[in-house]
Swiss-Prot record:
Name recorded for this polypeptide: Protein H339R
Domain of life of the source: Viruses
Subcellular location: Host cytoplasm; Host nucleus
Alphabetical keyword list: Host cytoplasm, Host nucleus, Host-virus interaction, Late protein
Main localization (coarse): host cell
GO cellular component terms, A-Z: host cell cytoplasm; host cell nucleus
Length: 339
């Protein structure tokens, strides 16, 4: 039954490709034009939200813990900081619109009002790129340098790190774990508790990082888009069979390297063309035996796209233009290697 669903899904994509500009469809799948795949993005958003909540809650537990009674000034500063984090959390993450339509953790998005989906789409990128999430990701990056020690709750980390301060939160050096841990006022139980808090803070930050790293799209849908578009275009461009076969046979590289492509996509400011750039680059690097004939066929395919755009009197998207230039540059390099 599952196989049949996949077949129907591919048939739908094939039909859609016939009736839509391929690049527009690619943009839609990626979500760069405001369209997002709710079945993928909503679970991702929930994981980010939960991990952000866990991160702030950990700091809140520390602030209220008896051990902080020994550090009155630090306690007051931490209390104010936690209040600011909770206020930011309320502003970015307390939007129960879609949650109201959940049944046993699942959402039928066909039953969610369009205005609710549109509002979530508009705010999604703002939320995951917020100062709050960025702070936690920076905190994670700092602690990841000491991954093994923190996960083992090994206090040796507070000895080997240079300086008098070990603060895992950017721009908040008042939370100094060296100062807290090394105080003569602490019992061994207090010291163990402080290391446990550091451990919980790191695992929560890792949760945010891991959730953020989840692609916003279904990779299989993207593969089907590429294969279906190639299937349509090859009928209109004769004598380029070898180049098309190379593209079709290399789709496995998309799935294999997609996590890297997606990281580049996020790092580029959500430029979807970067995925195709890296994909084509990998095809060329994986194809050391591309002949001048196949190189010529690739150029013919590129020319087809240019002519199609010119015929329709459309201005080429700068991102698409960069992609075309990148492919041509790669082909030039391959040609030079052959000579």
């Amino acid at each position: 039954m599952a196989g049949r669903v996949k077949i129907k899904q591919k048939e739908l994509i094939d039909s859609t490709v016939k009736n839509k500009n391929v690049m527009n469809l690619f943009h839609e799948i990626i979500g760069s034009k405001g369209n997002i795949n709710f079945s993928v993005v909503w679970p991702k958003f929930k994981k980010i939200k939960q991990s952000v909540y866990d991160y702030i809650s950990t700091l809140s537990v520390l602030e209220k813990a008896s051990v902080m009674q020994n550090f009155e000034d630090d306690k007051k500063l931490l209390e104010l900081f936690v209040q600011k984090l909770w206020a930011a959390y309320e502003g970015y993450f307390k939007y129960p619109e879609i949650e109201k339509y959940e049944v046993e953790g699942q959402v039928n998005f066909n039953l969610v009002p369009q205005y609710v989906l549109e509002k979530f789409s508009q705010l999604y990128r703002i939320r995951i790129n917020s100062e709050l999430v960025t702070l936690i990701l920076n905190s994670c990056a700092f602690m990841s340098k000491y991954n093994d020690y923190i996960l083992k709750k090994d206090p040796y980390i507070l000895t080997i790190t240079p300086g008098l301060c070990f603060s895992p939160i950017p721009n908040f050096e008042d939370l100094n774990f060296k100062h807290l841990y090394n105080s003569d006022k602490n019992s061994q139980h207090d010291k163990d508790f402080i290391m446990f808090i550091l451990y919980k803070l790191y695992t929560a930050a890792l949760g945010v990082y891991n959730a953020i790293s989840i692609p916003d799209i279904d990779v299989e849908d993207l593969e089907n888009i590429i294969l279906s578009s190639v299937s349509q275009i090859k009928k209109q461009i004769p004598r380029c069979k070898d180049a098309f076969n190379k593209i079709e046979s290399s789709v496995h590289l998309l799935r294999k390297n997609f996590n890297t492509y997606y990281s580049d996509y996020v790092g580029s400011g959500y430029n979807p063309t970067i995925i195709m750039e890296q994909y084509i680059k990998d095809i060329s690097q994986d194809s050391k035996n591309i002949s001048p004939r196949i190189s010529y066929q690739f150029r013919t395919i590129i020319k087809y796209y240019r002519d199609m755009i010119a015929t329709k009197h459309q201005t080429m998207d700068p991102q698409v233009l960069n992609l075309v230039k990148h492919v041509e540059k790669k082909l030039d390099m391959l040609d030079r290697e052959k000579n």
